[in-house]
Amino acid sequence: MNIENTLLKQDVWRFIDNTTINPAFDAIQSFATDDTLCRSVGARMAPSTVRGWVHEKTVSLGIQDSKLPDIDKGIAFLQKQGYRVVVRNSGGLAVVLDSGVLNLSMVLPDAERGIAIERGYETMFTLIKDMFVDCNEVIEAKEIEDSYCPGSYDLSIQGKKFAGISQRRMAKGVAVQIYLAIDGDQTTRSELIRDFYTISGKAKQTKYTFPDVNPNVMGSLSDLMKNDISLNGTLVRLFNSLRHYAGDLVSGTLTSEELDLFPAYYERLIARNDKVLT
């Protein structure tokens, strides 16, 4: 058994389903939920948890994006295109969320600080390869520099990125988060972020590095696998993989203790977004 499989093998995996689009449950609430899970799972109040989540027409910005010289113009542009804009609390740069993008958060306890950063990335990479074991092409983990939100654990097929992984570490918990472009027009998503950076004045500054987004280096899983991959079908793949690794796989929601923790994390994110976006 290799080292990343030891993290996937859990006595219990809990799955929380937030994949049904609900206008009353926005991306800020999603990020606050992951903070709550870091706290509860890290304190062993709850089992290791995988949460699936989907949000319609949202652009999730990284903290670095907020430093763009003309960020106000960029945000106005995104809003004019019908997108909600939020600033998240995990690493990376701007990404697009919509009904064709499935986000997964894998939350694990790290009480002994035994989960090195690379180990967290490799664990999610292993899970995705297991879920799509029928892919005829090699799924690679490497940076696609001219994609949006480039990182060392971009997942790609034949050089085209379909997913990106980030991590959030707090309160003795680790949340490894991935967005998966399941279907939809990845070219349009890429052009949206490219234009956002142009309008936000990327060229006016040199302190930070922002990507020159090239839509030709990104694609959806449906296109890259030449198969009609659906969100529900991807969830079935996830369940099958987790069943392989779990002693027990349970479906649930936040516990009463977690619901008590949630408001403080939500209010913190609201304050951060108000500071950056207003």
Curated annotation (Swiss-Prot):
Catalysis performed (reactions): N(6)-[(R)-lipoyl]-L-lysyl-[glycine-cleavage complex H protein] + L-lysyl-[lipoyl-carrier protein] = L-lysyl-[glycine-cleavage complex H protein] + N(6)-[(R)-lipoyl]-L-lysyl-[lipoyl-carrier protein]
Signal peptide: none
GO terms classed as biological process: lipoate biosynthetic process; protein modification process
Domain of life, per lineage: Bacteria
Domain BPL/LPL catalytic residue range list: 44-250
Keyword Membrane: no
Keywords: Acyltransferase, Transferase
Active-site residues (renumbered): 149
Listed pathway(s): Protein modification; protein lipoylation via exogenous pathway
Matching InterPro entries: aa-tRNA-synth_II/BPL/LPL (IPR045864), BPL_LPL_catalytic (IPR004143), LipL (IPR024897), Octanoyltrans_LipM/LipL (IPR050664)
Example of a GO MF term: lipoyl(octanoyl) transferase activity
Broadest EC class assigned to this enzyme: transferase
EC nos: 2.3.1.200
Disulfide cysteine pairs (residue numbers): none
Gene disruption: observed consequences: Strains lacking this gene are attenuated in their ability to grow in bile, but display no growth defect under normal physiological conditions. The reduced tolerance of the mutant strain to acidic bile salts is likely due to a decreased branched fatty acid content of the membrane phospholipids, which results when L.monocytogenes is deficient in lipoic acid.
Gene3D superfamilies, A to Z: Bira Bifunctional Protein, Domain 2
Entry-linked PROSITE patterns: BPL_LPL_CATALYTIC
Site label Lowers pKa of active site Cys, positions: 161
Keyword Acyltransferase: yes
Misc. remarks from the entry: L.monocytogenes is a natural lipoic acid auxotroph and relies upon exogenous sources of lipoic acid for growth. Thus, this enzyme has not the same activity as its ortholog in B.subtilis which is involved in the lipoate biosynthesis pathway. The reaction proceeds via a thioester-linked acyl-enzyme intermediate.
Family to which the UniProt record says this protein belongs: Belongs to the octanoyltransferase LipL family.
Main function: Catalyzes the amidotransfer (transamidation) of the lipoyl moiety from lipoyl-GcvH to the lipoyl domain of the E2 subunit of lipoate-dependent enzymes. Takes part in a pathway for scavenging of lipoic acid derived from eukaryotic host cells. Cannot use lipoyl-tripeptide (DK(L)A), lipoamide (LD), or free lipoate as substrate.
NCBIfam families membership: LipGcvHLiptaseLipL (NF047857)
Protein name: Lipoyl-[GcvH]:protein N-lipoyltransferase
Organism field: Listeria monocytogenes serovar 1/2a (strain ATCC BAA-679 / EGD-e)
